[in-house]
Amino acid sequence: MAPQLLLCLILTFLWSLPEAESNVFLKSKVANRFLQRTKRANSLFEEFRSGNIERECIEERCSKEEAREVFEDDEKTETFWNVYVDGDQCSSNPCHYRGTCKDGIGSYTCTCLFGYEGKNCERVLYKSCRVDNGNCWHFCKPVQNDIQCSCAEGYLLGEDGHSCVAGGNFSCGRNIKTRNKREASLPDFVQSQNATLLKKSDNPSPDIRIVNGMDCKLGECPWQAVLVDEKEGVFCGGTILSPIYVLTAAHCINQTEKISVVVGEIDKSRVETGHLLSVDKIYVHKKFVPPKKGYKFYEKFDLVSYDYDIAIIQMKTPIQFSENVVPACLPTADFANQVLMKQDFGIISGFGRIFEKGPKSNTLKVLKVPYVDRHTCMVSSESPITPTMFCAGYDTLPRDACQGDSGGPHITAYRDTHFITGIVSWGEGCAKKGKYGIYTKVSKFILWIKRIMRQKLPSTESSTGRL
């Protein structure tokens, strides 16, 4: 009411002036002396500072216009408002194949990478084996602008054209008894007693090892085979490939005159768990150079003796498969190189020494070991790393393979199927800081392995328990 009264008084005063008839309105500078816009009552200096989102929208419910005053930006306001109204619709990561999610009110929008479409980027336009293995469970093959999935031996391609269905109870690579949340590793801190026993060694030892692994329970490492002689018992490991073939390291073959193979064993003190098999033939890669007569592993390391460190043992009688005895799957070379060896971890197992120069384990040990990139691998080794080798293991943690584990499996799991990716070969000490385990790269020998295995196919009897 006061402003209106003031205005009337001003107009009356102006009307009384001599020139009022011709000058009803004042110039702006004069008028502004009398007429001023009233400030908002909630803050004297609010117009001169940026908004406060906590005061405006958290402590009290705000409108979109009030939020806009705070952010002073349409895009930021829209992003905030979509979450503020009904939560973040992108929190569940609904966009497939690395699509980008943008939240909306009651919905979301996926921005797909090139080659994908659909509300959730779920449809692949241009399929590539280089992208998520073409969504194939096992093997992927490019065919023009499409891909073709196939499966390991003993599996059938699913109706969706991508999945692989086991054709029998004992198809390769099936870990029937899962670990039930158990990890194939120990805590980061090793018991002080064991730590003091880890002795340094300046000489590489090719007869490798499992240090600080966990006990492998019955059925958890069903592809494990062990090589035994009549004098020392277990001296090397191996991997079951089929009812009549076991993969191992070539340097293991030179350690004794008579070799037998045991499968299904997890505890050497319980003879009932293992099955002893006689050897018919042994195939050693022709490029492998055996150590000189009288050569001792721990005295001198001869690199040429451990390039092409691969051999295949043929059984006289077939291996009978069960829940505790199952072969590992043989990958294709491309699948191993492009998919399996780009996973974070592989799995090794064996009865080797529990620490360097220590006693051998009475129980089968298993350990997850990370893949190591080739440059780091080569820099860490005093001896050359050839194309038939790769590194795996820990830089500082005392976890590794050790003497007695040589020839054993390096397994990589993909979509719950376990594939053979390496053979325990050699290393510079056991769990030595800055050193890694060296493994034979199986992908380099896929054709050689298949050629050997075709020489004698399993009979109907040898295929018992496997389709």
Swiss-Prot record:
Q: Which UniProt keywords apply?
A: Blood coagulation cascade activating toxin, Calcium, Cleavage on pair of basic residues, Disulfide bond, EGF-like domain, Gamma-carboxyglutamic acid, Glycoprotein, Hemostasis impairing toxin, Hydrolase, Protease, Prothrombin activator, Repeat, Secreted, Serine protease, Signal, Toxin
**What residue ranges carry the coiled-coil annotation?**
none
Question: Per the database record, which ranges form the Peptidase S1 domain?
Answer: 210-454
Q: Which GO terms describe its molecular function?
A: calcium ion binding; peptidase activator activity; serine-type endopeptidase activity; toxin activity
> Which SUPFAM superfamilies did the record assign?
GLA-domain, Trypsin-like serine proteases
Record PTM text: Gamma-carboxyglutamate residues are formed by vitamin K dependent carboxylation. These residues are essential for the binding of calcium.
Tissue note: Expressed by the venom gland.
Pull one GO CC term from this UniProt entry: extracellular space
Enzyme class name: hydrolase
Catalytic reaction annotation: Selective cleavage of Arg-|-Thr and then Arg-|-Ile bonds in prothrombin to form thrombin
Q: List all disulphide bridges recorded for this chain.
A: C57-C62, C90-C101, C95-C110, C112-C121, C129-C140, C136-C149, C151-C164, C172-C329, C216-C221, C236-C252, C377-C391, C402-C430
Active site (catalytic residues): H251 (charge relay system), D309 (charge relay system), S406 (charge relay system)
Enzyme nomenclature, EC number = 3.4.21.6
Residues of the propeptide region, as annotated, are 21-40, 182-209
Report the leader peptide range.
1-20
Control of this protein's activity is summarized as: Activated by calcium and negatively charged phospholipids.
Q: Which Gene3D superfamilies match?
A: Coagulation Factor IX, Laminin, Trypsin-like serine proteases
* Major place of residence: secreted
- Name the PANTHER family on file: COAGULATION FACTOR, COAGULATION FACTOR X
Q: How does it assemble?
A: Heterodimer of a light and a heavy chains; disulfide-linked. Is associated with omicarin-C non-catalytic subunit (AC Q58L90) in a non-covalent manner.
| UniProt record similarity statement | Belongs to the peptidase S1 family. Snake venom subfamily.
| Miscellaneous note of the record | Is classified in the group C of snake venom prothrombin activators, since it does not require the mammalian factor Va for the cleavage of prothrombin as the venom contains its own non-catalytic factor Va-like molecule.
Q: What is this protein called?
A: Venom prothrombin activator omicarin-C catalytic subunit
